[in-house]
Amino acid sequence: MDIANLIQNLKQTLQNASNERHLIELKNIFVKQHLLPLYDELKKSDNKKEMGLLINEFKQQIELITNQALVELNNKSDQIDLKKWANKTLFTPFIKNGHHHIINNIIDDIAQFFKKLNFEIVSGPEVVSPVYNFDHLNIDENHPARATADSFFINSVQMLRTHCTTTTAQVLENNPHKDIRIMSFGNVYRKDDDDATHSHQFNQVDFVWVKEGLTVANLKWLIDSLIKYLFGQNLKTRYRLSFFPFTEPSFEVDVQCFKCDLKGCAVCKKSTWIEIMGTGMLHENVLKAANINDIKTGMAFGVGIDRIAMLKYEIDDIRYLYSNNFKFNAQIK
């Protein structure tokens, strides 16, 4: 029995198959003619072991050749001759390309800044416990934000977060013995009436850095570096003492108006300064709530991404950022 010659004949036969069903039929005919009779001969053979091995090898080669032929047949059916059917004169409607939203672009820019400083970029749940939204952040029971008139409560133990600092509180609690460098971002919710400068939902970036030896000087250096990175200018900054429950001391950060050359304009409301973010050193009660060693100090800031977008691109109505107006979105890439 010349197996090599039979296999060669099978290859040539299967090349004539017009489709998968035809190919299987040709294979079955070959098996019936050349493989099955060998089993009858095996019964009469004096050397059943040797002949059995030969038959098994023959069977495996038949399956291998059939599978190869099937792959080749499928490849042929996938090849389309474009010249035969393509109509180059056929009208194709213009498809407008999409691009990242400016909110996403600014978040990406800030994330890249912090990645260069080895900060971890994290995000947390938007539905949180008041424990993390208020209690662990030194916001007492009489604070106005805890009222249902100012915050969205789902029930007594769940609410929509009013700031991304909730993620900070959870990270601090889960890593009390580590130096912490994180930037968190996401949607936050407050019961504001929607108008040109307010929205019940907006985007925020929050950062926290905890280790031994951090001071206000480190905080100022970091924020000044971020502002320069975002706006591409050596803008002057001003730190005004303020109050936030979770930081002490607390500051409002202003930048010198970059639109009017200190002449006063609509962007800075004629003051030549633009309020841009709140910041400060983490309050000792926030660190205690997370069981962090009192030797360590921490600093944090929170900034509204929507506000940064409005300042950077001179947008006078925050609602443009959410209106899905293609003409508006196409102007800013």
Swiss-Prot record:
Biological processes annotated in GO: phenylalanyl-tRNA aminoacylation
According to its UniProt record, the EC number is: 6.1.1.20
Question: What are the names of the required cofactors?
Answer: Mg(2+)
Question: Can you name this protein?
Answer: Phenylalanine--tRNA ligase alpha subunit
Going by the UniProt record, its keywords in alphabetical order are:
Aminoacyl-tRNA synthetase, ATP-binding, Cytoplasm, Ligase, Magnesium, Metal-binding, Nucleotide-binding, Protein biosynthesis
Q: How does it assemble?
A: Tetramer of two alpha and two beta subunits.
Broad class of enzyme this protein falls into: ligase
- In its UniProt entry, the species of origin is given as Ureaplasma urealyticum serovar 10 (strain ATCC 33699 / Western)
PANTHER family attached to this UniProt entry: PHENYLALANINE--TRNA LIGASE, MITOCHONDRIAL, PHENYLALANYL-TRNA SYNTHETASE
Q: What is the lineage of its organism?
A: Bacteria, Bacillati, Mycoplasmatota, Mycoplasmoidales, Mycoplasmoidaceae
Q: Where in the cell is it found?
A: Cytoplasm
